[in-house]
Amino acid sequence: MDNILKASLPKLREKLLEALQAVLPIVAIVLVLCFTIAPISPSILLCFLLGAAMIIVGIMFFTLGAEMSMSPMGERMGTMLTKTRSLPLIIGVGFLLGFLITISEPDLQVLANQVPSIPNMTLILSVAAGVGLFLVLAFLRMLFGIPLPRLLVLFYSIIFMLAAFVPKEFLAVAFDSGGVTTGPMTVPFIMALGVGVAAIRSDRHAADDSFGLVALCSVGPILAVLILGIAFQASDSTYIPPVLPEVNDSVELWQLFREGLPTYFKEIATSLLPIILMFGVFQLVALKLDKRTIGRIAVGLAYTYMGLVLFLTGANVGFMPAGNYLGQVLAGQSFRWVLIPIGMLIGYFIVKAEPAVYVLNKQVEEVTDGAISAQAMGMALSAGVSLSVGLAMVRVLTGVSILWFLIPGYTFAIAISLIVPKLFTAIAFDAGGVASGPMTATFLLPLAQGACVAVGGNIVTDAFGVVAMVAMTPLITVQLMGLIAELKTRKARKAQPAFALAAAYAELPDDAIIEL
């Protein structure tokens, strides 16, 4: 165990640098705003800065922990499950995995508290069942080679038809649910399951099908919440703003965070327990991994646990109040339009601080053998999220229905999926679920809510939907990246024979060329 801990220290330093690069730009933007056009109280600023420090350390531990534990656990379980060749077992265990992982997702608890007229447990169980069913569907798609675009066309058509019957106060929250439930606990494990299942297949489309699980699992919650919205006819919507902190000294500042820590210690322990138990059953029955591998996974789980506790405490206690108050101040100015470019700038950098984004970018680079680098993937995600936050701020200021953005956006995304390589489509729809994580829920959503309060808008119809917008735009930007890469490849292939012929002639002696 000591050797494993020592071996992980250089990696921790590497992850710390990555975390600093991700979070410091957001801190810099907020500080510039605070000292220029958007003054905030010292209490909120101090909470934000301490929260940022906790988020940096949290990302450092989580990203290394996910590499050491969540990814290998998911891959081995996915591979072992597929090796059984038992369809009933794959369906049963697949549903159970999806159900348990979703119930344990911390962000789902936040969503449940925000949805009016539906009991929390009813919503949580319904969403978990939706993810479980669609995880099974994702497994079956991979095993039988069903094209992902066909399923996406079918289910998003059903979603938009159901949207016509859902009260407008409920619509944005329903679409937000798809992004929120694929959070930092769900994504690394589900993506690793996909890689494990695809590893058994030896055909040329196996790599293409190793992605797409998160895409389909994001559909389940949207359908579940839309159906619940119709059944419960939810129309009584109330908004409870976050409590703005007031501290007089450093002891009171630490007291705020210390009070939040036990909540997240408990939440993350509850989140990890079902996954650990399922892996324990697999280990006893089939995997039989050696002690060193189990030790590495155990250390990784400890890092994951510490990382998520620190990250969520920093995000909820430090970032959420700052985002809300900043939104109110910016939208309260006579030049409130500035909220749009500032939102785009924050959106560009904030996706880099999403814990699960690191897992996605790394797996994309590995599965594509470097054809899609982690850096290129990060740029595509940042561009997409920047655009989506800008559009979300337009909605806040104008009150335009979210459907005016979602229907054209998804129509275009699904249309280009018919001409883009399958791998890029699967990665793009996975990226949508990954990009809309806890940073979106704890900073961008409060930013929109605060701005909505300042302009006198409807919180439920105008501010909610930020998560849905963030989940939509990467579908377009990542696929466009894939389309450009494909066009470049085709151009290179066409040019290759001419270059090869010229090279062949160049190698011949002059008299040989004359004889030809």
Regions of interest found by a model, annotated:
Residues G78-M80, L87-I158, R336-S417:
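Helix-loop-helix junctions within the multi-pass membrane cores of secondary transporters/permeases
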Residues V32-L46, A66-G74, L100-V115, F134-I146, ...:
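Transmembrane helix-loop junctions in multi-pass membrane proteins
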Residues L24-I37, G51-F61, V93-L100, G130-R141, ...:
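Hydrophobic core segments of alpha-helical transmembrane domains in multi-pass membrane transport
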Residues V243-A356:
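Transmembrane helical segments that form the transport core of multi-pass membrane transport proteins
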Residues M1-A19, V23, G74-P88, S202-L213, ...:
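Intrinsically disordered, low-complexity non-transmembrane regions of multi-pass membrane transporters
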Residues D2-N3, A138-V153, K168-E169, V173, ...:
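Juxtamembrane and boundary regions of transmembrane helices in multi-pass small-molecule transporters
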Residues E14-A22, L46-A52, M80-P88, L148-V153, ...:
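Alpha-helical transmembrane segments and their helix-start/interface "positive-inside/aromatic belt" motifs
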Residues R13-A19, I40-L50, T82, V115-I124, ...:
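Interfacial loop-to-helix junctions that mark the boundaries of transmembrane helices
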